[in-house]
Curated annotation (Swiss-Prot):
This is UPF0502 protein Bcep1808_3727. Disulfide bonds: none annotated. Belongs to the UPF0502 family. Pfam families: DUF480. It comes from the Bacteria. InterPro entries: DUF480, WH-like_DNA-bd_sf, WH_DNA-bd_sf. It comes from Burkholderia vietnamiensis (strain G4 / LMG 22486).
Length: 236
């Protein structure tokens, strides 16, 4: 599936920090979505890191924090700083350092910005970066990224009730797949994911409150009508 055989040999990299990973994702995204302002200034890059939409998790970082993270990325040659402008501007160098084609960069970028995604979600969310013909082509590039000597992505265990597996990037280090195994690791179909359990607890509380409200309403109406609702009914 690799359509660019002349790519350089990938380099071994250390684990990135979450902010370093976010910066790389923002640089690739803005390269495609706002090319007129790319390479990005520090201000624009910080705004992209703190963006509320299309980000998971949402961050709130300062320009000083972004500057420190940029220094680390420049040391890895993943980011380059331009010198043709009075305002420092930054661009990514992921294709050459990682040795992967633009299609794979697009998928990796979405994972860096949005967290775990299914192949279908990746195809949809990467449309502005690269148009994949079908889900199979997305999966082919993901499989290549996962099969590298230093894997860049991993297929997560299917979540309970989910129809598809999700994928996650490994730029920030390996993940414990057991944390994502859900009912498969819990040993039974009765296991409930934490989010669903919290939703069930909230629904139970709502129902309890509703029953209490209705009981109070019945008691008030009975008092107004002179009816003793606690009295036993006729035995026959």
């Amino acid at each position: 599936m690799n359509t660019t055989p002349d790519l350089p040999t990938p380099r071994a990299l250390r684990e990135l920090t979450p902010l370093e990973a976010r910066i790389l994702g923002v640089l690739v995204e803005k390269q495609h979505t706002v090319p007129d302002t790319y390479p990005l200034s520090l201000n624009a890059l910080t705004a992209g890191c703190n963006q509320k939409t299309a980000r998971s998790p949402v961050m709130s970082v300062s320009e000083d924090e972004v500057t420190a993270a940029l220094d680390g990325l420049k040391h890895l040659s993943l980011v380059m700083e331009g010198s043709s402008s009075r305002v420092p501007r930054f661009e990514h160098n992921m294709n050459r350092v990682l040795g992967i084609p633009s299609q794979a960069i697009a998928l990796l970028t979405i994972l860096l910005l949005r967290g775990p995604q299914t192949a279908a979600e990746l195809r949809l969310n990467s449309a502005r970066l690269h148009g994949f013909a079908d889900i199979s082509s997305v999966e082919a590039f993901l499989d290549e990224l996962a099969a590298r000597a230093q894997p860049l992505v991993v297929r997560l265990p299917r979540a309970p009730g989910a129809r598809e597996n999700r994928w996650m990037h490994l730029m920030c280090g390996d993940v414990n797949l057991a944390d994502f195994a859900g009912s498969d690791a819990g040993g039974g179909a009765d296991s409930v994911p934490p989010s669903e359990f919290e939703a069930l607890k909230a629904e139970q509380k709502r129902l309890v409150d509703e029953v209490a409200r209705l009981n109070a309403l019945v008691q008030r109406m009975a008092t107004e009508l002179g009816i003793d609702v606690d009295a036993p009914g006729d035995a026959g």
